[in-house]
């Protein structure tokens, strides 16, 4: 497997102000094989970025000995695909159509997508959507994106996040299968499920549907967002995860998504990723 760094682990990454070249330089210096870039409606990489800009990023990545492991976005948190307001849903679908093209231009084939939310734990002002309504709107939204993803050869990789939606591996599996497309899969985050389940079970159940892996660690005894800790300091059983990944023949990217940025966190993360996976 190839170890990858999320653009968001570096200072200014989550805010979208860190130059991509600087993030790639840091990832290269820390010994990562790849970097997962972040895309937003504003910042250094957006859905309006041009092919020429993407070509330049890709060329620079190769010069630094890096691959681009995927593209991630948090736009669905503020413009939810399952919002009551149709204009909000149209806004995020338009953004995602364009972001899928940017993903292809960047030479990678996985786009991290949050399909909607029943609620948003870090935005108490956000509306609460009934689960069944959320489910139908999420299906409708992704259905409108599938043909674009297939034409571009990019996968819509649905991440399991703290959105009170798609709460079990069986439900995630069946939701993905609904679209009957090789270009819809999972961006599986091992830390995000630890509070309510076992990552290794999710991996075996999702199997080949997994397009990419996110690596985090979490302490169940804390049980809130404060439970996300540095790698090897929580309760994630990385040996069990590696065994499960081997069983499904996954040998792709494992991306450290350690947020928010803290001093020394990128260095600690790189060392831990090498210890776990190298």
Q: Where are these predicted regions, by residue range?
A:
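Positions that flank functional sites
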Residues: 42-43, 76, 118, 164, ...
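Residue-level preference for long, well-ordered alpha-helices that form the structural scaffold
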Residues: 16, 50-53, 85-92, 127-134, ...
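N-terminal pre-domain/capping segments
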Residues: 1-108, 143, 181, 267-278
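Active-site acidic/histidine proton-transfer and metal-coordination neighborhood
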Residues: 17, 21, 25, 60-67, ...
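Active-site loop/turn elements of alpha/beta-hydrolase fold enzymes
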Residues: 37-40, 73, 113-116, 161, ...
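A short acidic, helix-capping loop that chelates divalent metal ions and anchors anionic groups
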Residues: 43-45, 77-83, 119-124, 195-196, ...
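Acidic-residue sensor for enzyme active/binding pockets
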Residues: 36, 159, 257
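Histidine-acidic metal/acid-base catalytic patches
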Residues: 1-3, 7-33, 62, 143, ...
